Amino acid sequence: FVVFILADPARYFQFYFPXFFQHR
């Protein structure tokens, strides 16, 4: 699981914090 986050941190954050990306 941790490896997946390290492999694609952007995708992980986008999935966990969609509002943060939508704010832009």
UniProtKB/Swiss-Prot annotation:
Physiological role: May mediate relaxation of depolarized colon tonus. It binds iodocyanopindolol and SM-11044.
Name under which the protein is recorded: SM-11044-binding protein
